[in-house]
């Protein structure tokens, strides 16, 4: 009897010790894919709120850059991921632009994604190298018109918003320029810094750090009104092109089929993060205009933007070379 009791106690002690030795349940990890490289609006926005969102979720949110092909590499990855809320994309208007510009994609930009959280809109800064000797947008237009096909502009990649912003302006101004696609906004701005290209339409985040820097000249802003972080840069509309406006949205999407309860949970956590003063300050510095809306309202915005970007692509004549 005593032997059996000692054996039982020994086994129980071993079992309890084993249970205590087991690691705690792994924290949930959410991948937030950014389909562009450092310097892009999407990358800066993702890093502005993801840590706080993670705290509200009780999870880890890892920002993962998957740049290339106008954002389609990252979008394809997310479209093919399980619809469980663990893989999201920080997308923007380039998500729809690519859908209208690429002849064939292995995913549907509309049907394969569901809106989670709207994060804002942003304009672009038409920037040139001072070596050109052009001080105003009018100077730039005059010079580019005198040399059709001789001026080049860099972008964050084929089908990116930086591509279409410049293409849309070229169409409005009657300019013929060659497109030089890069892998990121940072790379595109570097091309201007080195005076290897004549222009870039950069996200505010890509050039605001160069404010006052003699290596760059910021000629115009494509937004509806001047950005508070570059208040001396006039809008394109102010400079002889009334009504011109190019602004891109940024937002968080999930694979289609993600349960609505999961979308609502993710959206609620993001909204709580965006309501924090520290996050609002970071977002404001990115030049984004933000207003809280529901996932349903965001989905309606996505449908409208799909049509808008299709028209912009058509009017601009932009295409994938």
What is each of the regions a protein language model found here?
Residues 41-45, 49, 53, 70, ...:
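Stable alpha-helical elements in mature extracytoplasmic
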Residues 22-111, 150, 158, 174-201, ...:
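N-terminal (or domain-start) structured segment
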Residues 80-86, 100-187, 236, 249-282:
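Hinge/capping helix and adjacent helix->loop/strand transition within the periplasmic-binding protein
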Residues 27-29, 171-175, 260-321:
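An extracytoplasmic/periplasmic, membrane-proximal ligand-sensing/linker region
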Residues 1-23:
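Twin-arginine (Tat) signal peptide motif
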Residues 121, 207-275, 304-307:
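C-terminal lobe and pocket-closing loops
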Residues 90-95, 155, 185, 202-207, ...:
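Beta->alpha turn/N-cap motifs
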